[in-house]
């Protein structure tokens, strides 16, 4: 009897371990633009998902893409209505929103999720095709206009901040900028550049993702940051530049 109980317990343990092993969460696959395009071309039925804002989508997007704004109130309900048996290819501007969206898709049961590394910014930089019905490459500030603004502040450090209304880390940094300006005793001038409304400047300054920050002194770019930068780190960098 004891032997039977032992065997039964062993079988139960093996089944439990097997069940745990097969219960691992699904993960999305990250692909570079070239591989992303190649796989899209060879895939049969699939969903191509652009998770940027409608405004961003209207300017430039991949052919055949469906737009569901990751930050939209209806994001979860809309992706919940998609066919979970089809592979999903997802992208955004530079990869932040698409990575989060890919995680959400796998969490709700999509088993084949592919996310584009570097987003549409990298896609365009590598000369892959886009649809651009409403895109005006010349709108917004020119490089010459920006340079004039920088040169006009010769006695200060100039911080050029590329941001967007939908960018969470951009908002976080914008909130502490007034305090940073005060800490720098009037020696810091901040120029905000909206990423979506200044495409020619984005291209000229080679901004691939946001937030993007540049520090200028005497009209010369001294330091560049990609991504969120803590207030204290910026203060240290600015103080270093201000030292005689």
List where the protein language model places each region.
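Short pre-active-site segment immediately N-terminal to redox-active cysteine/selenocysteine motifs
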Residues: 156, 162-166, 209
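Structural micro-motif
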Residues: 205-214
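Typically the conserved alpha-helix immediately C-terminal to a functionally engaged Cys/Sec
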Residues: 171-183
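Bacterial N-terminal signal peptides
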Residues: 9-19
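Rhodanese-like catalytic fold shared by cysteine-dependent sulfurtransferases
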Residues: 3-6, 20-46, 54-87, 97-155, ...
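C-type cytochrome heme c attachment motif
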Residues: 165-172, 212
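Aromatic-flanked redox-active Cys/Sec active sites in thiol-based oxidoreductases
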Residues: 54, 93, 161-167
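Thiol-based oxidoreductase modules, predominantly thioredoxin-like and allied folds used
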Residues: 67-72, 162, 181, 186-199
């Amino acid at each position: 009897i004891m032997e039977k109980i032992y065997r039964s317990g062993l079988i139960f343990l093996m089944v439990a371990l097997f069940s745990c092993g097969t219960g691992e969460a699904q993960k999305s696959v990250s692909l570079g633009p070239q591989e992303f395009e190649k796989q899209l071309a060879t895939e049969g039925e699939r969903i191509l998902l652009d998770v940027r804002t409608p405004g961003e989508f209207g300017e430039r997007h991949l052919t055949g893409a469906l737009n569901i704004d990751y930050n939209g109130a209806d994001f979860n309900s809309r992706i919940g209505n998609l066919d979970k048996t089809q592979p999903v290819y997802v992208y955004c501007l530079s990869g932040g929103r698409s990575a989060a969206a890919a995680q959400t898709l796998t969490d709700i049961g999509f088993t084949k999720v592919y996310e584009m590394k570097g987003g549409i910014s990298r896609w365009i930089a590598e000369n892959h095709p886009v649809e651009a019905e409403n895109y005006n490459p010349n709108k917004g500030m020119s490089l010459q206009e920006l340079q004039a603004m920088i040169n006009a502040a010769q006695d200060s450090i100039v911080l050029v901040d590329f941001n967007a209304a939908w960018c969470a880390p951009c908002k976080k940094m914008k909130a502490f900028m007034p305090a940073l300006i005060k800490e720098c005793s009037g020696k810091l001038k901040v120029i905000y550049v909206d990423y979506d409304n200044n495409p020619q400047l984005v291209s000229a300054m080679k901004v691939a993702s946001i937030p993007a920050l540049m520090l200028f002194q005497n009209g010369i770019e001294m330091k560049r940051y990609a991504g969120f930068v803590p207030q204290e780190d910026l203060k240290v960098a600015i103080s270093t530049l201000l030292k005689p």
